[in-house]
């Protein structure tokens, strides 16, 4: 790793000046670029998250530093996914499930990076297709109602075999990495982030017998809604799904690549972020 990773692209999601993090991000950008230079890396800034505009820059980089929260990391991972480049997150924000380090730990991380003392985690990603339009999802693909009234009927197939019809507000198809995101809020299960599976979690289903379903990633899935619906990617991008138009979902041939500290332990992250084992007074 230390012989080939020399150019670091720095992702910063555009932030309005009224955002509470605006000033902190502006200061951090300059500090990070200076630190990368001091540590012997070439670097450049990407702050548009516009894949077409930044394609040549993405090809130039060996890895990407994502400055912000999990939303910034997700946007960067989707944008770089087809280029098969690793990313790592420097947390400036709230929860930071995906982040490798805090800002004050970046210098040590970069030094470990140069000495090949970090690890590469490869996670399952989703590849979706509607008609001729293809896309990737890192956390989840959601089929959601386009209008507030009524329920949305979604027929689900594994290959050509129908296995369920969901009737409710929609359906989450999550990756293991995304199982602690929207899926968890919808009472879906936590699945180890390095597992090879899909998690299907209904949203406010009309039937009280519907429960989340975990399927092996060897399945190719497709879904049809009885009326026009929205397909939401990682909570950041949307596509229209016409009535009875199939949405195809399968395991992406390219993995999501995250650089993390060697000491990172998934169960420790769950315990710290979700406050497992803490007393109710501490949680408040």
Swiss-Prot record:
Role summary: Involved in the regulation of the intracellular balance of NAD and NADP, and is a key enzyme in the biosynthesis of NADP. Catalyzes specifically the phosphorylation on 2'-hydroxyl of the adenosine moiety of NAD to yield NADP.
Record's Gene Ontology CC terms? cytoplasm
InterPro entries in the cross-refs: ATP-NAD_kinase_N (IPR017438), ATP-NAD_kinase_PpnK-typ_C (IPR017437), NAD/diacylglycerol_kinase_sf (IPR016064), NADK (IPR002504)
The places in or outside the cell where this protein is found are: Cytoplasm
Q: Which reaction does it catalyse?
A: NAD(+) + ATP = ADP + NADP(+) + H(+)
Q: What's the cofactor?
A: a divalent metal cation
In alphabetical order, the GO MF annotations are:
ATP binding; metal ion binding; NAD binding; NAD+ kinase activity
Q: Which residues bind NAD(+)?
A: 70-71, 139-140, 167, 169, 177, 180-185, 236
Q: What class of enzyme is it?
A: transferase
Pfam families assigned = NAD_kinase, NAD_kinase_C
Active site at 70 (proton acceptor)
Listed EC numbers: 2.7.1.23
- One biological process term in Gene Ontology: NADP biosynthetic process
Which protein is depicted? NAD kinase
Alphabetical UniProt keywords: ATP-binding, Cytoplasm, Kinase, NAD, NADP, Nucleotide-binding, Transferase
């Amino acid at each position: 790793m230390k012989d080939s990773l020399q150019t670091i692209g720095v992702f910063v999601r555009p932030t309005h000046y009224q955002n509470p993090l605006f000033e902190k991000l502006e200061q951090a950008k300059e500090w990070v670029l200076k630190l990368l230079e001091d540590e012997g890396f070439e670097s450049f800034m990407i702050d548009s998250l516009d894949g077409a505009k930044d394609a040549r820059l993405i090809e130039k980089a060996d890895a990407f530093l994502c400055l912000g929260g999990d939303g910034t990391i997700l946007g960067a991972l989707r944008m770089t996914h087809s280029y098969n480049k690793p990313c790592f997150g420097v947390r400036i924000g709230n929860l930071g499930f995906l982040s490798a380090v805090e800002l004050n730990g970046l210098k040590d991380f970069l030094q470990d990076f140069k000495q090949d003392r970090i690890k590469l985690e490869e996670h399952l990603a989703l590849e979706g297709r509607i008609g001729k339009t293809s896309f990737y999802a890192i956390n989840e693909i959601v089929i959601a109602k386009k209008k507030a009234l009524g329920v949305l009927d979604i027929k689900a197939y594994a290959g050509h075999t129908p296995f369920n019809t969901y009737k409710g507000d929609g359906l989450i198809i999550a990756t293991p990495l995304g199982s602690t995101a929207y899926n968890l809020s919808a009472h879906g299960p936590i699945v180890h982030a390095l597992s090879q599976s899909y998690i299907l979690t209904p949203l406010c289903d009309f039937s009280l017998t519907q429960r989340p379903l975990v399927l092996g990633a060897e399945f190719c899935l497709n879904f049809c809604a009885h009326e026009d619906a929205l397909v939401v990617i990682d909570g950041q991008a949307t596509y229209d799904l016409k009535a009875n138009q199939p949405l195809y979902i399968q395991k992406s041939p390219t993995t999501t690549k995250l650089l993390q500290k060697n000491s990172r332990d998934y169960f420790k992250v769950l315990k710290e972020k979700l406050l497992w084992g803490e007393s109710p007074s501490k949680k408040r």
